[in-house]
Amino acid sequence: MNNITISESIKYIGVDDTTLDLFESQYIVPNGVSYNSYLILDEKIAVMDTVDARKTKEWFDNLDKELKERVPDYLIVSHLEPDHSANIQLFTEKYKEAKLVLSAKAKAMLPQFFNIEGLDERCIVVKEGKELDLGNHHLKFIMAPMVHWPEVMVEYETTEKILFSADGFGKFGALSHDEDWACEARRYYFNIVGKYGAPVQTLLKKASTLDIKMICPLHGPILKDNLGYYIDKYQIWSSYQSEDEGVLVASASIHGNTKEVALKVVDLLKEKGVKVAFTDLTRDDMAEAVEDAFRYSKMILAGATYDGGVFTPMEDFLHRLQHKGYQNKTVGLIENGSWAPLANKVMKDMLTPMKNITICENTVTIKSTYKDENQEAINQLVEEICH
């Protein structure tokens, strides 16, 4: 167990997973992930969520170590996604008198995951603002539907002023790996929670009324210092503002010719002092490309024509942006095609339904390979995207 100190009465009992290759079977996690769980020791004892089934033994070992032969009274179920709920059934079988504290939606969904004997008698359903008295500690329940599942709730511990934020403020990366918070928190947010900006805004508004001294998420580090920094990031991300002025250049090239043009654009932008990120959609992490698309204020797409459409990595990228609510951006288009270039039309058609997307009037069409005659169109696109 990570040697993490929260307070004398509140213990960390979570587990690192450093061998997981794909989170949610799609997001690469080179530095692993943490499944966070907490224990409040008072006159009554509350366990805050469980962990993924991959780490059942370690979690129960951590729990038993901190309980010191005491028995939990409550299991708080903030979120039913299996990486946090997998051990609910085992918990109820081991601690037969313990109650499950959860939202009405979570109780309705629970039988879809588990067959818990005497479920009605085991559950305490809580509503907005309800408080659970543990003795010196009190948990206030705040409903957070669609952050990012419908049953989610967060908890505010009123004595030590701790927000248990469920998946909010989470990040990729095991706690044993020390790294900057923002990068992997941003990638986590836009790929996991990003579609649900409005519910996140609602939760942030509720949280703004609380005196929060610490944030304990279900993934990633416990946040104690400079909480305004993390909250400001979430305000920006959930309101679909651009975090940085700059341009993401995203290339989907079959034989390298489209990528060559995209890299020329990158060089021109850098010469103008523009902050630039480049992604090769055929090879780079797609989740990181999504992250950067939301991070920067502008984007240039360079896509090859393929089967009468656009090369599939670009199509996949744009579908992901559609699903995640991409909006409030300026986008430039570059296409390549040897006999019937159609990529710009397809990319434009995919972008048009997105909210508040401005597509540059100047576009670039390459016929197979870059020629000097293409430079003027490239220059015009770069000038437009810079203004």
Label each region the model flagged.
Residues 43, 54-101:
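Active-site metal-binding motif and surrounding structural segment of the metallo-beta-lactamase
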